[in-house]
UniProtKB/Swiss-Prot annotation:
InterPro entries, alphabetized: ESCRT-II_cplx_Vps25-sub, ESCRT-II_cplx_Vps25-sub_N, WH-like_DNA-bd_sf, WH_DNA-bd_sf
Keyword annotations of the record: Cytoplasm, Protein transport, Transport
Name of the protein in question: Vacuolar protein-sorting-associated protein 25
Assembly: Component of the endosomal sorting complex required for transport II (ESCRT-II).
Subcellular location: Cytoplasm
Record-stated family: Belongs to the VPS25 family.
GO cellular component, one term: phagocytic vesicle
One Gene Ontology MF term: protein homodimerization activity
GO process annotations (BP): protein targeting; protein transport to vacuole involved in ubiquitin-dependent protein catabolic process via the multivesicular body sorting pathway
Native species: Dictyostelium discoideum
Function: Component of the ESCRT-II complex (endosomal sorting complex required for transport II), which is required for multivesicular body (MVB) formation and sorting of endosomal cargo proteins into MVBs. The MVB pathway mediates delivery of transmembrane proteins into the lumen of the lysosome for degradation.
């Protein structure tokens, strides 16, 4: 984590930003701005999961601007998160809760969301390039080595969320660039040159 504080964009300091806009085109632009802000903030602090209830309850600075006395409501935040999910940059952590939500649109059980400020295919490209650049093709690495190893310390995917890493490795498997295998709790990955 950086010692510096995240710099919020100017629009974060405008009161209308915290109120869902009634005009569709304006709301689309507003949701895009919220998506950009949430992804940038999460990337800056390497946040991979957000708990909506906790963010609202704790008055998270991301959703609560005390200087202008404005904060997002839980309903507004859920609408924004739903839009981010629709755009492929997030998903509910508990898939069963997502299914429940489809049955009952007013369901408030969805709380934890996986934030993907890079999509799995982007992470897959970065990981594969790193493996190739380090001369690790046709060798076996553990998921732990990719996430936490000394060789990956300077890589953006160092300490990457396990769920996102596994999704990224699935992308590489579909491209025939790697194969994952597990023994007990350890997951290994063999990367192939193609």
């Amino acid at each position: 984590m950086s010692n510096q504080v995240f710099q919020f964009p100017p629009y974060y300091h405008k009161e209308p930003f915290f109120t869902i806009q009634p005009i569709l085109n304006t709301r689309k632009k507003q949701f895009q701005m919220w998506q950009d802000l949430i992804l940038q903030y999460c990337r800056y602090y390497k946040i991979y999961e957000l708990d909506i209830n906790e963010s609202i309850k704790s008055n998270s600075v991301l959703f609560n601007n005390e200087k202008i006395n404005r904060k997002l409501s839980r309903e507004a935040l859920k609408s924004i998160i739903d839009d981010i999910i629709e755009n492929g940059f997030a998903e509910w952590v508990d898939k069963e809760k997502e299914k429940e939500k489809e049955k009952d649109k007013d369901n408030n059980n969805n709380n934890r969301v996986l934030i993907m400020w890079r999509k799995p295919d982007e992470w897959a490209s970065l990981i594969y390039k790193w493996v190739a650049d380090c001369g690790l093709l046709n060798t076996v690495l553990t998921v732990w080595e990719i996430q936490n190893g000394d060789d990956s310390k300077k890589q953006e995917f160092h300490q990457l969320n396990t769920t996102i890493l596994m999704k990224s490795l699935k992308v590489l498997e579909k491209q025939s660039k790697c194969q994952t295998f597990s023994q007990d709790e350890n997951v290994g990955v063999k990367f192939f040159s193609i």
